[in-house]
Amino acid sequence: MSLAFNPAATAFSGNGARSRRENFPVKHVTVRGFPMITNKSSFAVKCNLTTTDLMGKIAEKFKGEDSNFPAAAAVQPAADMPSNLCIIDTLQRLGVDRYFRSEIDTILEDTYRLWQRKERAIFSDTAIHAMAFRLLRVKGYEVSSEELAPYADQEHVDLQTIEVATVIELYRAAQERTGEDESSLKKLHAWTTTFLKQKLLTNSIPDKKLHKLVEYYLKNXHGILDRMGVRQNLDLYDISYYRTSKAANRFSNLCSEDFLAFARQDFNICQAQHQKELQQLQRWYADCKLDTLKYGRDVVRVANFLTSAIIGDPELSDVRIVFAQHIVLVTRIDDFFDHRGSREESYKILELIKEWKEKPAAEYGSEEVEILFTAVYNTVNELAERAHVEQGRSVKDFLIKLWVQILSIFKRELDTWSDDTALTLDDYLSASWVSIGCRICILMSMQFIGIKLSDEMLLSEECIDLCRHVSMVDRLLNDVQTFEKERKENTGNSVTLLLAANKDDSSFTEEEAIRIAKEMAECNRRQLMQIVYKTGTIFPRQCKDMFLKVCRIGCYLYASGDEFTSPQQMMEDMKSLVYEPLTIHPLVANNVRGK
């Protein structure tokens, strides 16, 4: 089967895409040093291409050279696969694959059948072979990494003739290693990383866009947030990346200026939605009086950026906002427990959450305790009412329980460090995965993802494992970047506990402790991938994907510093994702002006 799209059958919700003939005036304002667009769309030029037009063009281009479609496609389905896989990869890289989910699923089903037959159209081309492996594994198909074993050893690859784009595809495939025993992918990752780094060092990639793409992948592959990856790919997009002859003819016609304009405008629509959500979060923050607190981290913009970066669909606005609200609330209360509040005040917040009842102002003990409790109380009560509608049942008790659990861990950690209690690494990790906040943020926001979540699902071992693995990744990577600061504050984490446990071994260094912590994080990341990619589990894939997205946040924040507390790279990324719209390609803009 060839990849063909039916314009009439492809759903475009009002939230997902507007008519491409709409042209909104652009108004710029400045918010804390950032330019902001206040209109409903950030289209800087009028593009004479409607959604229906684009779907028609896609259907037309994908038919190929034989007008007797799809009959001709049924004759040689394997021959279409290289171009189909390149198209799927491009739709994903440019962030518009959500419009074609059913079509993509159909193609991957066909691809898997060809994979099982070891069809030459897939296996004879190294780049297509690697791409098929990656797309199928991520989708949940059982594909053995041993199929890539011929490329695992650098000695079996002609490094003088192999193209950089092909090595990139091998590198991307190697990132999907889920098992400890997948030695082929481990070897593949090692030599492709070395090869690409050497290409950068010797400045031997003449294509500037390809050079930047290699830099981007090598910088922090596990920490590429979905929408940041889309932004980067839109900036660096080049059809010549796909050089397989079968793909090139058909594919180059589709990926024209119109298609790129569609993807860029879709990005701008999502960006405008993220700006609107930031304004909502800022109003909520002020309504909760959290802006009056004189201590701790104000992470409203950070929370908005992180949620916008991992959850792109415009219709999932509630998911993003609820997730961001809980990042803010958890951070504020964590800072209170760690630095601002007295032990008694911290205990008081937990008692209030357990009782779940508003009090006269005098009974809170301090204004800060009142602000923090009422912020949680009012926010969760409102969310519980809305979640009741979404879920068709009351989930209020479950949501409150999540808050009781995380604050109980905050209290336990406060007591441990305040009393200088001896702690083993296992003791620490058994609780600290909860206090990192991933679990509460994910399960709170997931109530609004559009899927009914039963108690059986939420209380299942699978849910616990998903929460624990993603939280362990974020906790361990956070510990690696913050252990020096926490040691000065007389608190501990996994790195300091590893050092303490090996204090009698003079050869055990900080570097060794960091290496072990990173290995533990990587092990949990792979275990998380195994659960997410596995089919037939209690959680639908859309829910499980949320955990993998949050895992990328941890890899993004703590790759080389603490971007959450001291954002540097994040500030630049925030500008490009939330504040700076993409312009239509100059050629398209010129064509439009000439009409």
Swiss-Prot record:
Catalytic reaction list: (+)-copalyl diphosphate = miltiradiene + diphosphate
GO molecular function term, any single one: miltiradiene synthase activity
Residue interval of the organelle targeting sequence: 1-47
Biological processes per GO annotation: gibberellin biosynthetic process
Record field: transmembrane: none
Primary localisation category: plastid
Keywords, in A-Z order: Chloroplast, Lyase, Magnesium, Metal-binding, Plastid, Transit peptide
Chain sites annotated for binding Mg(2+) 3: 478, 486
Induction (free text): Induced by jasmonate (MeJA) in roots.
Bound cofactor: record note: Binds 3 Mg(2+) ions per subunit.
Residues the record lists as binding Mg(2+) 1: 334, 338
Biological pathway: Secondary metabolite biosynthesis; terpenoid biosynthesis
UniProt xrefs under SUPFAM superfamilies: Terpenoid cyclases/Protein prenyltransferases, Terpenoid synthases
Motif (DDXXD motif): 334-338
Location of the protein in the cell: Plastid, Chloroplast
Cofactor section: Mg(2+)
Any single Gene Ontology cellular-component annotation: chloroplast
Its EC number(s): 4.2.3.131
Residues the entry annotates as binding Mg(2+) 2: 334, 338
Family: Belongs to the terpene synthase family.
Domain notes: The Asp-Asp-Xaa-Xaa-Asp/Glu (DDXXD/E) motif is important for the catalytic activity, presumably through binding to Mg(2+).
Function statement: Involved in tanshinone biosynthesis in hairy roots. Catalyzes the conversion of copalyl diphosphate (CPP) to miltiradiene.
Record's protein name: Miltiradiene synthase KSL1, chloroplastic
UniProt organism field: Salvia miltiorrhiza (Chinese sage)
